[in-house]
């Protein structure tokens, strides 16, 4: 029985945030004592109507963050260019917008300090939804709606860590289906 192969695999702890080689990560933020001075990499902010999913047709404020821990070849989001804005500046842009529902998107919004966003924005009456690739566990009690859009067909070795949510977004690439 000496020629029997040992199929055992040593399990290793996975990092909290998995990063693909070509990923564009936002810079680390310095610690701040005032939440309103927390800085976020903002690609764009705009008011629009949610166009997909359960909340399609709902008036929403979209905050698109820079940086992503994946590098999906089909992604058309320019998340590698952003403007650093304080939370105070972000609120100033949102205040005149006619709704209180925020959709956090990206890039990968779970790379940001979501707890700080929740501490400041929820008492102001905002609800927070997120569109995430699911590779980062989200803080509990901060988000009102979670849409997980896994990319495991492109990154089969990247673990989906956010295994609960309100909505699953499945994106099928025709090149993978081979019709």
Question: What do the predicted segments below correspond to?
Answer:
Residues 131-138, 150-154, 174-175:
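Short, polar loop motifs at secondary-structure junctions
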Residues 163, 170-175:
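Glycine-rich S-adenosyl-L-methionine
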Residues 128-130, 146-148, 168-170:
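Hydrophobic faces of well-ordered beta-strands that scaffold small-molecule active sites
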Residues 1-37:
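Radical SAM enzyme core and accessory elements
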Residues 54:
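S-adenosyl-L-methionine
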Residues 177-179:
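Conserved small/polar residues in nucleotide/adenosyl-binding loops
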Residues 139-142, 158-165:
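Short, conserved loop/helix-junction motifs that constitute active-site signature segments
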Residues 27, 35-36, 40-47, 59-66, ...:
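Conserved Radical SAM active-site core
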């Amino acid at each position: 029985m000496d020629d029997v192969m040992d199929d055992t695999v040593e399990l290793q702890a996975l990092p909290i945030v998995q990063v693909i080689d070509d990923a564009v990560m936002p810079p680390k933020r310095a610690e701040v004592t005032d939440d309103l001075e927390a800085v976020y990499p903002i690609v764009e902010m705009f008011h629009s109507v949610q166009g997909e999913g359960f909340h399609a047709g709902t008036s929403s404020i979209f905050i698109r963050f820079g940086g992503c821990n994946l590098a999906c070849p089909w992604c058309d989001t320019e998340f590698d260019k952003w403007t650093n804005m304080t939370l105070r500046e972000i609120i100033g842009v949102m205040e005149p917008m006619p709704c209180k529902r925020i959709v956090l998107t990206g890039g990968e919004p779970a790379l940001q300090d979501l707890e700080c966003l929740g501490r400041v924005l929820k008492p102001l009456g905002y609800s927070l939804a997120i569109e995430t690739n699911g590779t980062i566990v989200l803080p509990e009690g901060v988000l009102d709606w979670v849409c997980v859009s896994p990319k495991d067909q492109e990154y089969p070795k990247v673990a989906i860590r956010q295994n609960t949510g309100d909505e699953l977004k499945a994106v099928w690439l025709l090149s993978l289906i081979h019709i």
